[in-house]
């Protein structure tokens, strides 16, 4: 079992009696049915349905003050606090950043620790679990879990191998819809919960099957192409390269154009380097461009 302190993650807290209802009406996940010690992968969208931030909503135990922790990209925490405060209106909720907390990820096994609040990563079982804790006890928490404490780059390689996108790296906040970033494939959108900000646009894409962009696992014969370079098929641009580790990576691709290229036997190139699609945890939609 391995564990890594994710220095790019931050934590905020939403508390108060209306906190559950408040979050449920805003984010893409179902917060009403969330139980203490468990998490939901979710996003806050613009009214036009584009992702402002993706994060985990974790219900705090009652003996820890209740409410909800939000495990989010650290760089987005101040803006997320501001945005949630904008939406709270007269709701009697408090929204505050918890700069004393960090996030530890653990995988290749499941353990338990008394050094923080641990929960299973709701996106994929293979992603293991996460722990909200003060960063200075990361070593003790890893030992408690029975895990070897490794560098965050090991976790990145594991994430990329599973084909799981990372916000701000594999997709740009404010530019993409949930389907573009595979949130629907990773349990990040509850299509049965009813209204949330941007819900009409997202539901329309889901029911019409009109998602054009997807983030997919890719591979190279040697080292992967650099983040941000164009992916081409012949003289057409079909996507953009994202994060990578060794000879594997992720790329945001126009699924219809890739399907056409594959049918015509046209090779894919990323920054001029031959690239192929690989079998991954969330690549099945490539078999059906309408997925």
Please describe what each predicted stretch is:
Residues 5-26, 94-108, 210-220:
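Short glycine-/aliphatic-rich beta-strand segments at the starts of folded cytosolic domains
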């Amino acid at each position: 079992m391995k564990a890594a302190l994710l220095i790019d993650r931050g934590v905020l807290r939403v508390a108060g009696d209306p906190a559950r209802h408040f979050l449920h009406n805003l984010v893409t996940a179902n917060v009403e049915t969330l139980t203490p010690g468990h998490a939901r992968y979710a996003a806050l969208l613009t009214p036009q349905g584009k992702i402002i931030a993706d994060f985990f909503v974790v219900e705090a135990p009652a003996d820890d003050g209740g409410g909800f922790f939000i495990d989010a990209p650290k760089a987005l925490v101040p803006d997320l606090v501001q945005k949630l405060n904008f939406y709270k209106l007269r709701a009697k909720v408090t929204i505050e950043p918890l700069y004393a907390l960090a996030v530890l990820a653990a995988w290749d096994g499941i353990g338990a620790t008394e050094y923080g609040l641990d929960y299973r990563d709701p996106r994929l079982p293979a992603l293991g679990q996460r722990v909200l804790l003060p960063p200075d006890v990361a070593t003790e928490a890893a030992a408690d879990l029975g895990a070897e404490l490794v560098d965050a780059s090991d976790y990145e390689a594991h994430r990329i191998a599973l084909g799981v996108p990372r916000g701000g790296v594999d997709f740009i906040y404010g530019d993409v819809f949930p389907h573009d970033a595979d949130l629907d494939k990773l349990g990040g959108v509850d299509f049965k919960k009813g209204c949330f900000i941007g819900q009409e646009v997202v539901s329309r894409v889901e029911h019409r099957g009109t998602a054009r962009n997807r983030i997919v696992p890719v591979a190279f014969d040697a080292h992967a192409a650099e983040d941000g370079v164009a992916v081409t098929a012949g003289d057409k641009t079909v996507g953009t390269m994202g994060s990578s580790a060794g000879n594997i990576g992720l790329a945001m691709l126009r699924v219809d154009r890739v399907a056409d290229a594959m049918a015509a036997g046209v090779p894919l190139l990323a920054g001029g380097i031959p690239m192929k699609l690989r079998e991954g945890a969330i690549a099945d939609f490539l078999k059906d461009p309408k997925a």
